[in-house]
Amino acid sequence: MGKRGSRSQSQLLNTLTKKQKKHLRDFGEEHPFYDRVSRKEAKPQICQLSESSDSSDSESDSESEPQQVSGYHRLLATLKNVSEEEEEDEEEEEEEDSIVDDAEMNDEDGGSDVSVEEEMAAESTESPENVALSADPEGKEDGEEPPGTSQTSPEEFTDAKHESLFSLETNFLEEESGDNSSLKASQDPFLQHVNKELKEKAIQAVATNPKTTHELKWPILGQLFFSSKFQKLETFKPPKDIDLKSLHLQKPLESTWTKTNSQFLSGPQKSSSPFTPLQKELFLIMNSYRDLFYPERTALKNGEEIRHVYCLHVINHILKANAQVLGNNSRRRSQKFGVGDDDDFRDQGLTRPKVLIVVPFREAALRVVQLFISLLEGDSKKKIIVSNKKRFQGEYGSDPEERPPNLKRPEDYEAVFVGNIDDHFRIGVAILQRSIRLYAPFYSSDILIASPLGLRTIIGGEGEKKRDFDFLSSIELLIIDQADIYLMQNWEHVLHLMNHMNLLPLDSHGVDFSRVRMWSLNNWSKYYRQTLLFGALQDAQINSVFNKYCVNMQGQVAVRNVPMTGSISHVLVQLPHVFQRMEAENLASVIDARFNFFVNKILPQYRDAVMSHTLIYIPSYFDFVRLRNYFKKEELNFTHICEYTQKSGVSRARHFFLQGEKQFLLFTERFHFYKRYTIKGIRNLIFYELPTYPHFYSEICNMLRATNRGEEATWTCTVLYSKYDAQRLAAVVGVERAAQMLQSNKNVHLFITGEK
């Protein structure tokens, strides 16, 4: 019996976890949590934890079986005992330390760190954070998440406390804010836009109507193309002097805007106008509810200036829309009306979210929210209520110490990659009079701020069980900021988003259909949606989105200034630039035509050992993979660096290329965008395709002077282009030269830079 008892005891010990063994050793008994109770299933009892607790430890699947809850458990659940939580944290740390120690022992014995990786993998599969992320259908695909950005997202939090406080259905317009006179004014742009009723004939004619276009010239914006598929096209003149009262701004924006925007106003301009000249022209277009494409927004120059003005437009739109709803709530409560009066109160969409702001990084989302707070607060001594502000600053802010102090990069790089550059996020914001609710559930939000990847993971794809895009059904204002960066992230996410905008929702989501506008019920929301698109360059893919998905009845305004001098003028080294034009029958055949031209015409010239130290710059990752496979097949002496290359691989490739051990270096544009390393040892340069960013051309060319060993006379630069690269070519060589090169009978053109 003794042996049998000791054997059963040892078996019992073997089944215990490290935490259980530690508790047994310290206290002489198992923790009550692990008491073996009757296996008879009992109805689970829910114990409410105190609201002061910021986080709750989720039990694993094996421990989540329904058990009888003793009075002791209920007591533990209600106690605010911090010491026990700290004790558990210490136990977890000790457990992690033991795992690390075991791994170090294995390393010393010649073993690998596979055990640590397996342990981390096991933990990651159990964590709810990674379970949520596994829903990403493209999480493993190439081009999904570029380097320099976080590939994980913290467990999604939504504010459940302030639902009734920010509800549009149960609140009424406060008398102190008043029913703003601008809402009653017939000339108010907001009311003119949302109250305009389209006719069925006009909608049907859009499919067949040709697009009418007017060309305008404004002092600051320059060349504008104003187009519309609706018959009536009213041209408008550039603004002269703007009075804030004439803009129909909702309270308190008239008083708060001047202070919020003061950093951009200086000298005599400060007293005369509350806008900069650029802001003045942009806001006139925004306030007219026309679509806008502005391709000259740069992080280094005017990025913040533009962010301020579109945030003003967003808050103005939301305050007016919510004031209309709350005012109608008050009217419905104060007066008796019959069934026929319901149409007087149609003031909403099918879902509550009205504004979607797409930004690339968390830092941009942080700045947008800070501007919202500033615009609602202003000089007022009475602070506005911002729920979950501390959590938001913790998740979207950044620690200055995280950035290496000795990191030297170009100014434009520093301006783009500032702060928290995680690119997987989404957050709902609700605004009610002078209060802001951060982390609002999407269907209780007025404004959604998200990255393309953050939206992609919730929208999902065809055939997925968990997907949701109903919250996009009633978006009235879409802002896509820094659109050029999405070309470097994953442009497919932007296209996926646009394909799901303003579709009829699959669920009612508790909407009162008697309050829904008729044009929303008719599924005409896309004709009322205003889209503001900001980027740093003219690109065919961005132009395509604007032309295809922007069908606002008010018309579209696109800024189309042509570059007179190209980025080639910033090349400082003495270098011959040979531009070789290739012929392609159509746009679809360009990719194959370029590859065949390069393999048959260009590459044979560089196979000789004399033409060593050749860097091949490749904008497209798919072209990079194709060339890499070809080089391997042909057994060429080459190395490569792309956005997915490990740091050690990058160091080896740079070393081999500098020493001449590898003749060719395949180099992707996205790696250059995210890292901006200076590649030393370049003597011959090939641009497989013109760069997306024109200033990358001069940056890459100027790398040749990084190792100046008296070889300037042998340096070469070859550029491939076709007639379909007109925009990129104009940005590099200037519009006049580009036109000559595209129309010329000659296929080869030579430029020489750096001549003394």
From Swiss-Prot:
Tissue: Expressed in colon.
Biased composition (Basic and acidic residues): 25-43
Modification comment: Phosphorylated. Phosphorylation is required to promote p53/TP53 degradation in the nucleolus which promotes cell cycle progression and liver development.
Phosphoserine, modified sites: 10, 50, 52, 58, 60, 62, 64
Induction: Down-regulated by the miRNA MIR195.
Short name of one Pfam family: UTP25_NTPase-like
Highest taxon in the source lineage: Eukaryota
GO cellular component, one term: small-subunit processome
Protein localization: Nucleus, Nucleolus
Renumbered residue ranges of the record's region Promotes p53/TP53 degradation: 1-185, 573-635
Keyword terms of this UniProt record: Developmental protein, Nucleus, Phosphoprotein
GO molecular function: RNA binding; rRNA binding; U3 snoRNA binding
Family in the record: Belongs to the UTP25 family.
Protein name per UniProt: U3 small nucleolar RNA-associated protein 25 homolog
Lineage: Eukaryota, Metazoa, Chordata, Craniata, Vertebrata
Gene label: UTP25
